[in-house]
């Protein structure tokens, strides 16, 4: 693969929204991750704890019930 195509793919991967986007993201349901009562994201959003990898690039994240940071609160919900 030439350098131009590699750099384009690199920037596309960097620009992917990780965790919760502007309109919310419920994550991807993968059987190995849902058995832990968790979901898969491109990176754990604030308020989620990392557990394992899902399919090598996704992160299996579990919602934190205690000690959630202030960033975990959804600004769109009043």
Curated annotation (Swiss-Prot):
GO molecular function, one term: lipopolysaccharide binding
Any one cellular-component term (Gene Ontology): extracellular region
Entry keyword annotation includes Disulfide bond: yes
Entry's Gene Ontology BP terms: antibacterial innate immune response; antifungal innate immune response; defense response to Gram-negative bacterium; defense response to Gram-positive bacterium; killing of cells of another organism
Family matches, as InterPro entries: DEFB136/42 (IPR035307)
Tagged with keyword Disulfide bond: yes
Subcellular location, record wording: Secreted
Pfam families xref list: DEFB136
SUPFAM superfamilies, per database record: Defensin-like
Disulfide bonds: 33-60, 40-54, 44-61
Superkingdom of this protein's organism: Eukaryota
Family (UniProt): Belongs to the beta-defensin family.
Entry protein name: Defensin beta 136
Organism: Pan troglodytes
Lineage: Eukaryota, Metazoa, Chordata, Craniata, Vertebrata
């Amino acid at each position: 693969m030439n350098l131009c195509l590699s750099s384009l793919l690199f920037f596309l991967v960097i620009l992917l929204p990780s965790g919760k986007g502007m309109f919310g993201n419920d994550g991807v349901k993968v059987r190995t991750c849902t058995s832990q009562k968790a979901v898969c994201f491109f990176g754990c959003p604030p308020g989620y704890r990392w557990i394992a990898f899902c399919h090598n690039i996704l992160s299996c994240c579990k919602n934190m019930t205690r000690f959630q940071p202030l960033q975990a609160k959804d600004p769109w919900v009043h």
